[in-house]
């Protein structure tokens, strides 16, 4: 059973402007929004702005799927990359909201093309 659905689109140029701007501002943004593992993954890629944009879209989509819980922090939502498809780890307020909703599984898909990054998050319950 689908308990929540979130979709978000981010312009890669928006993230590129932040990364190319004043270093202190870029660092504050990255530290506030992305976990160390996310930063390491994105910074190791030539298209780092695209990778950051996709992860930012995933976090926005997750917040929408969770019903925009009060107090959720960007670092409560972490896009993980194993050997296969990306996944989304929830912590803190986001994890609490998911538990209250009865979420059994979080589905995440990311894509990027034509200067935009798109993410969709589906929250699935244990029911039929």
Curated annotation (Swiss-Prot):
It holds the Pfam family ACPS. Transmembrane segments: none annotated. One of its GO terms (cellular component) is cytoplasm. It is an enzyme of class 2 (transferase). One of its GO terms (biological process) is fatty acid biosynthetic process. InterPro entries: 4-PPantetheinyl_Trfase_dom, 4-PPantetheinyl_Trfase_dom_sf, ACPS, Ppantetheine-prot_Trfase_dom. Its cofactor is Mg(2+). Keywords: Cytoplasm, Fatty acid biosynthesis, Fatty acid metabolism, Lipid biosynthesis, Lipid metabolism, Magnesium, Metal-binding, Transferase. One of its GO terms (molecular function) is holo-[acyl-carrier-protein] synthase activity. Belongs to the P-Pant transferase superfamily. AcpS family. This is Holo-[acyl-carrier-protein] synthase. It comes from Anaeromyxobacter dehalogenans (strain 2CP-C). The lineage of its organism: Bacteria, Pseudomonadati, Myxococcota, Myxococcia, Myxococcales. The gene is acpS.
